[in-house]
Regions:
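Short, Lys/Arg-enriched N-terminal segments with co-localized hydrophobic residues
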Residues: 4-14
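N-terminal Rossmann NAD(P)H-binding glycine-rich loop of SDR-like oxidoreductase domains
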Residues: 17-39
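N-terminal Rossmann-fold cofactor-binding loop
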Residues: 46-51
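NAD(P)H-binding glycine-rich loop region in Rossmannoid oxidoreductase-like domains
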Residues: 52-110, 114
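Conserved Rossmann-fold NAD(P)-dependent oxidoreductase catalytic core, especially the SDR/UDP-sugar
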Residues: 84-86, 96-161
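Short-chain dehydrogenase/reductase
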Residues: 102-109, 147-148, 155-170, 198-202, ...
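NAD(P)-dependent short-chain dehydrogenase/reductase
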Residues: 171, 176-239
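Mid/C-terminal beta-alpha module of Rossmann-like enzyme folds, strongest
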Residues: 237-331, 336-341, 345, 362, ...
């Protein structure tokens, strides 16, 4: 078990900012860790249930935020924390169905409470909390919503842990009379480099391509009819977290965050085929949730053949059902586009080319030996 060092307990006077990143091995958390770890004047404290498999300068704490006693024991000595980036989420085995349950909402609210309570007790001078949401705030998991979605749009039918968390966070600050501010970021289809994340389509693309190639098949798109999508690079979210935590214009505000363009899988799929040196085949709709688990025994052979890190297929892609959802399998086209004008007006102007993003992230997963070249 990774232990909290005395330097973190007492605080390092040479550091201007001390940030806790919850979910530091998730898609967003990992990008945030690497971003803040590279900044001058920031000390990073990373929270996760498992140790990292990459070099970094953070102090790691192994903690299960679902366990209130464990969280209090591990986090109650975190003095001098100035920022919290909350990038963790509890997902049920059937990810999409879980979104509609009260259990999903209750567990995610409790996790936030189990962290913020002892953290604020130990670090009363906390300045800022960044909380992540997404298009479920606009009912995207329920069906089509008004386009473009704006931060001022009314809420949709609960249960929804986004609403529970943001209400509790505001009430808790008022109850304590605390001085910290908060910012809520709402990204769209978050893409990054991560292992064990149930909502990371990049890993799903890489594994699907590698397995298809191993069988000698062309790369066929398995999703639904053509549709216009919108995505957010996790590295972009990390930069937005820095902005949100240091710019007064972001205080106590909600912002949609996206790459700034749109995409269609039909345009991206040829780029992926080229990256894996595969022939591009015609679209072949099929459920990856039904077909890919049956290929789990092939993955160790791919790992050995290409010298990859020894993760299982389930480690790499915990939820093929989520990949089906993002690919639009069995769905009619259902655009989920958001307006990012509010963030731009408030000073966050960063953007990313989505096609280039997918190629870069897949290449990084290859370089880190998660998927084959």
């Amino acid at each position: 078990m990774l232990r909290l060092s005395s330097a973190v307990n007492t605080g390092d006077e040479n550091m201007t900012n001390r940030i806790v990143i919850a979910g530091a091995l998730g898609t967003v958390g990992r990008a945030a860790l690497e971003h803040f770890d590279a900044l001058e004047g920031w000390e990073v404290i990373a929270l996760s249930r498992r140790p990292p498999d990459f070099d970094n300068g953070a102090t790691w704490i192994s903690v299960d935020l679902r366990d209130a006693a464990d969280a209090k024991d591990k986090l109650g000595a975190l003095k001098g924390v100035t920022h919290l980036a909350y990038a963790t989420v509890y997902e049920m085995p059937d990810v999409a169905k879980g979104w509609l349950t009260r259990e999903h909402a209750d567990v995610n609210l409790a996790m936030l409470q189990n962290l913020v309570g002892p953290l604020v007790d130990a670090s009363p001078d906390l300045r800022h909390i960044t909380l992540l949401q997404g298009t479920k705030a606009y009912g995207g998991h329920l069906g089509p919503f008004k386009i473009p979605a704006k931060e001022s749009d009314p809420r949709y039918m609960p249960p929804n842990f986004y609403y529970d968390q943001m209400d509790w966070l505001a009430d808790e600050r008022d109850r304590r009379g605390a001085g910290w501010t908060w910012t809520i970021l709402r990204p769209q289809i978050v893409c990054g480099v991560a292992i064990g994340s149930p909502m990371n389509v990049v890993a799903g693309i890489g594994a699907f391509a590698a397995i298809s190639r191993e069988y000698g098949m062309p790369l066929r798109f398995p999703g639904g009819d053509p549709r216009i999508g919108e995505a957010t690079d996790a590295r972009l979210i990390a930069r937005a977290m820095e902005w949100a935590g240091t710019d007064a214009r972001a205080a106590d505000e909600v912002f949609n965050i996206a790459n700034g363009d749109v995409y269609q899988w039909e345009a991206i799929w040829p780029r992926i085929a080229k990256l894996f040196d595969m022939e591009l085949g015609p679209r072949h709709p099929m459920s990856l949730a039904r077909t890919m688990p049956g290929n789990a025994d092939l993955w160790p052979k791919i790992v050995e053949k290409h010298g990859l890190l020894s993760y299982s297929l389930a480690d790499l892609v915990p939820s093929w059902g989520f990949v089906d959802f993002i690919f639009g399998h069995g769905q009619r086209p259902n655009p989920h586009n958001m307006s990012t004008i509010k963030a731009r007006k408030a000073g966050f102007h960063d953007c990313v080319d989505t096609e280039e993003m997918f190629v870069e992230l897949l290449q990084e997963m290859q370089e880190r030996r998660y998927i084959p070249r």
